[in-house]
Amino acid sequence: MKLNNYIDATLLKPDATLIEINKFVDLCIIKNVRCICVHISRIAVVKEIIKNTKISISGTVSFPFGNATTKLKINEIKECLKLGANEIDFVANIGNIKDHDWEKVNSEFQKIRNSFKDIIIKVIFETCLLTEEEIIKCCQIAVKNKLDFVKTSTGYSKMGATIEHVKLMKKIVNNECKVKASGGIKTKNFALELVEAGAERIGTSSISEVLN
């Protein structure tokens, strides 16, 4: 297995400078990662650096809290694509999930999928804030709406990916959707364990350590 093919390299800290971004993307090119995930304002910069590679760009949407309206999320996705992204990592409305307002959760997923049928869409649940039943329900709604990935975490809450959550998500989505693990993945061994548990993408900023 080539672990680099699973890696979504992330640089999402708010104080990342252009110098840091350039160095990070250069490392991503050397390591030949699958995708680079950045904030919307940095997409164009990354696109220029990787223009002669096969690396994808994913833009984050309503990150990290997910509390924008669906209309705003759709507009942000449009802007990400205009700037050069070809994948999207959007944060679900966590409040609606905790309220068990599944109609609103479904409506958001449905409107986003129907608006963008031909790009890879990953939905972030922030699993550390959810019960097992809530994770299951979110996965079922994601599958129903044909989202491409269910994703564990933003990396900005109290905990990141766990083996248990990845196994649970994989069990629910089966082969109808894929699982992305992210948050707190700082070693190669942990990344490999998550892949073994069912993750098909690994989101990490620790590229040198994970791909050593």
From Swiss-Prot:
- This protein's GO CC annotations: cytoplasm
Q: Which reaction does it catalyse?
A: 2-deoxy-D-ribose 5-phosphate = D-glyceraldehyde 3-phosphate + acetaldehyde
Record's keyword terms, sorted: Cytoplasm, Lyase, Schiff base
Q: Key word Phosphoprotein present in the record? A: no
The entry's active site is: 89, 151, 180
Name of one Pfam family that matches: DeoC
Pathway annotation: Carbohydrate degradation; 2-deoxy-D-ribose 1-phosphate degradation; D-glyceraldehyde 3-phosphate and acetaldehyde from 2-deoxy-alpha-D-ribose 1-phosphate: step 2/2
Q: One of this protein's GO BP terms?
A: carbohydrate catabolic process
**Highest taxon of source:** Bacteria
User: EC number(s) in its UniProt entry?
Assistant: 4.1.2.4
SUPFAM superfamilies on file = Aldolase
Q: Which GO MF terms are attached to this record? A: deoxyribose-phosphate aldolase activity
Q: Mainly resides where?
A: cytoplasm
Cellular compartments annotated: Cytoplasm
**Coiled coil located at which positions?**
none
**Role:** Catalyzes a reversible aldol reaction between acetaldehyde and D-glyceraldehyde 3-phosphate to generate 2-deoxy-D-ribose 5-phosphate.
**Family that this chain belongs to:** Belongs to the DeoC/FbaB aldolase family. DeoC type 1 subfamily.
- PANTHER family per the UniProt record, alphabetical: DEOXYRIBOSE-PHOSPHATE ALDOLASE (PTHR10889:SF1)
* Name assigned to this protein: Deoxyribose-phosphate aldolase 2
